[in-house]
């Protein structure tokens, strides 16, 4: 009873105490203008959205970027006062071929980051072009003078790079350090004050014998890479756990590693956390009411410790349910909204924190 009272008290005052961008969501599948309008009404602070290198940079021709789809997201988000956190991810087929990976498009090559100097330079150039377009004073804002100018100031580099599901042929700390350094160089060449955020680290990566690395081990090894601390400003965590105790312990452990390396100024970004409303056997399936209860207690914990742990964002996975293209056993029902956008009890709990409708 005491825990529930604390959670309710935290949610009642959250919108007055936290920065507007603190509470976020992660879309899975297509993101429409109606989705973003709903986010705006609900006072969603941040949408973490994939910035797909593989789709935007289709050929080796210089600066032949296809920005239209991402332009539409950024434009509607600006209208609705929703911040965008781009998660730069995936590899174009022409870069994969240059790297010697020739699997079909969308296969393992798409999640096999470049390792050669030429591939890393293409990656650096892509990130620089993205910041030049969407950052402060960017081309996008010049081309759209009637939009509220909301430049993107933080950029996330890859997703769950400690998991073979997202990093082929297997997770490698030194390879990721090179990827991160190239991205950071491109971003800061265009916006020296931009924040560079690590890809979200998952506690126990799956992948059979594929060589996943525990999230805490990956972060420790990353800090051991010479000069790498200058390349990033934020550490992202995906603290999935059936129990809230497990979620809390993951965040505390990651924070302790950051503090041990003298990087207390680096923020902790929860770029994915969530439970599902499904009823299957997976431990993250909690049913509709259980999902809402987990959100309420988790968000209350993050809100109460925001300043002490320097938590910059807590983003719920996912925004809306999906059908047929979920990336995990429980993900299809992880949304705050059903597939047809019907709100779940978890969405109502989310609104208690944001003060939205």
Locations of regions flagged by a protein language model:
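Noncatalytic carbohydrate-binding groove/subsite architecture in carbohydrate-active enzymes
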Residues: 22, 33, 37, 124-153, ...
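Boundary/entry segment of secreted carbohydrate-active catalytic domains
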Residues: 16-52
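Aromatic-rich peripheral "rim/lid" segments of glycoside hydrolase catalytic domains that contact
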Residues: 102-105, 151, 156, 161, ...
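Extracellular cell-wall/glycan-interacting regions and their flexible linkers
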Residues: 14-17, 355-357
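Secretory targeting and sorting signals
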Residues: 1-16
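Extracytoplasmic/secreted cell-surface and envelope-processing proteins
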Residues: 34-35, 56-60, 94-98, 164-167, ...
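Substrate-binding cleft and catalytic face of glycoside hydrolase catalytic domains
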Residues: 42-211, 227
């Amino acid at each position: 009873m005491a825990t529930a009272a604390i959670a309710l008290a935290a949610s009642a005052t959250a919108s007055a105490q936290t920065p507007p961008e603190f509470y976020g969501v992660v879309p899975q599948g297509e993101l429409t203008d109606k989705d973003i309008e709903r986010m705006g009404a609900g006072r969603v602070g941040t949408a973490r959205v994939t910035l797909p290198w593989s789709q935007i940079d289709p050929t080796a021709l210089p600066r032949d970027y296809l920005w239209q789809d991402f332009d539409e997201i950024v434009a509607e988000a600006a209208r609705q006062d929703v911040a965008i956190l781009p998660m730069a991810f995936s590899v174009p087929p022409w870069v994969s071929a240059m790297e010697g990976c020739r699997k079909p498009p969308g296969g393992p090559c798409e999640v096999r980051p470049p390792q050669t100097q030429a591939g890393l330079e293409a990656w650096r150039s892509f990130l620089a072009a993205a910041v030049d377009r969407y950052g402060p004073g960017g081309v996008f804002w010049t081309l759209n003078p009637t939009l509220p100018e909301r430049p993107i100031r933080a950029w996330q580099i890859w997703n769950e790079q400690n998991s073979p599901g997202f990093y082929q042929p297997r997770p490698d700390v030194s390879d990721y350090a090179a990827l991160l350094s190239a991205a950071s160089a491109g971003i800061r060449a265009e916006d020296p004050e931009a924040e560079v955020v690590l890809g979200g680290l998952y506690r126990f990566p799956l992948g059979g014998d594929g060589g996943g690395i525990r999230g805490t081990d990956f972060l420790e090894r990353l800090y051991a890479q010479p000069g790498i601390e200058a390349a990033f400003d934020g550490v992202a965590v995906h603290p999935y756990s059936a129990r809230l105790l497990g979620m809390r312990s993951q965040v505390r452990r990651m924070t302790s590693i950051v503090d041990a390396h003298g990087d207390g100024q680096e923020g902790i970004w929860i770029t994915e956390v969530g439970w599902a409303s499904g009823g299957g056997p997976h431990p993250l399936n909690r049913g509709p009411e259980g999902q809402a209860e987990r959100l309420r207690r988790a968000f209350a914990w993050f809100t109460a410790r925001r300043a002490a742990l320097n938590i910059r964002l807590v983003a719920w996975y996912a925004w809306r349910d999906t059908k047929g293209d979920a990336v995990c056993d429980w993900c299809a029902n992880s949304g705050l909204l059903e597939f047809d956008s019907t709100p779940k009890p978890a969405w109502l709990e989310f609104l208690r924190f944001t003060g939205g409708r």
